[in-house]
Swiss-Prot record:
Belongs to the glutamate 5-kinase family. GO terms for cellular component: cytosol. The lineage of its organism: Bacteria, Bacillati, Bacillota, Bacilli, Lactobacillales. Catalyzes the transfer of a phosphate group to glutamate to form L-glutamate 5-phosphate. This is Glutamate 5-kinase. PROSITE patterns: GLUTAMATE_5_KINASE. It comes from Streptococcus pyogenes serotype M2 (strain MGAS10270).
């Protein structure tokens, strides 16, 4: 029987999405953010190094500006995200401070990771922050980037951004928090007999199709970008866990080896009992 082994994991990238941070009412999920800060601070106290990739700038901005709908105009999207990013970081800073943990902000655009000099600079920034015991909080710089907005030239969403960050920081593990339990063989919202994939060692065409590619049973939902992110992690010889973010404390259970979510790890590195 395959067993998850995370005892040697030191550097962890955690990605949390807007759906985990913003309630269906559009209000901010303060309880969830507090739980996340507690978990990350607990991991830091145990000697782990944690980087947080956080979406939510648009959601925070809509809440602050009392806008019911996301604007369709690109410039307004950028303005709303700019307002929301400040509010989000302010809240993160306040809540993490309750657990004596300092945070910093790193905003990325595609050109930063494309050009060697800027990539080296941001890599050094990550290393310096981590060496100081600070949690870098990463997001795309929506105020100047059109990649994540409703625009044709997409860098990718924060799922892929988290995989990029895991790669450039040489993280031991990427934990992706979602509003689903993991990767299923088909859509659990449509098929009652859908089965959760506990482990994925190879990203096959079947998996890509079931996640949102051609002939998908999933349709929309963002699963394809998560599978693509896992593929990027594989290319960097890393591993990833896709799990439900409803209870951030489950991160601690995952690191204890409990079989929550879907574990993406290439087969040649899998350890057996």
């Amino acid at each position: 029987m395959m067993k998850r082994q995370f005892e040697d994991v030191t550097r962890i990238v955690i990605k949390i999405g807007t759906s985990s941070l913003v309630l269906p009412t559009g209000k901010i999920n303060l309880e969830k953010i507090d739980q996340l800060a507690f978990v990350i601070s607990s991991l830091m106290n145990k000697g782990k190094e944690v980087i947080l990739v956080s979406s939510g700038a648009m959601g925070f901005g809509l809440d602050i500006l009392k806008m019911e709908k996301r604007p369709t105009n690109l410039a307004k999207q950028q303005a709303v995200s700019s307002v929301g990013q400040v509010a989000m970081m302010s809240l993160y800073s306040q809540i993490f401070a309750h657990y004596q943990t300092n945070v910093s902000q790193i905003l990325l655009t595609r050109d930063i990771v494309v050009f060697p000099e800027s990539l080296a600079n941001v890599t050094n920034a990550f290393e310096s922050l981590i060496s100081l015991g600070i949690v870098p909080i990463v997001n795309e710089n929506d105020a100047v980037s059109v990649d994540e907005m409703d625009h044709a030239t997409k860098f990718g969403d924060n799922d892929r951004l988290s995989a990029v960050v895991a790669g450039i920081t040489k993280a031991d593990l990427l934990i992706m928090l979602s509003d689903i339990d993991g990767l299923f063989d088909k859509s659990p919202t449509i098929y009652e007999d859908a089965q959760l994939r506990s482990h994925v060692a190879v990203i096959t065409q079947e998996i890509i199709a079931s996640a949102g590619g051609a002939g998908s049973k999933f349709g929309t939902g963002g699963m394809l970008s998560k599978v693509q992110s896992a593929q990027m992690v594989f290319e960097n010889k890393g591993q990833m866990v896709l799990m439900n973010g409803a209870n951030p404390r489950d991160i601690l259970r995952v690191l204890e080896g409990q079989p929550l979510g879907t574990w993406f790890k290439q087969i040649e590195e899998v350890r057996h009992d």
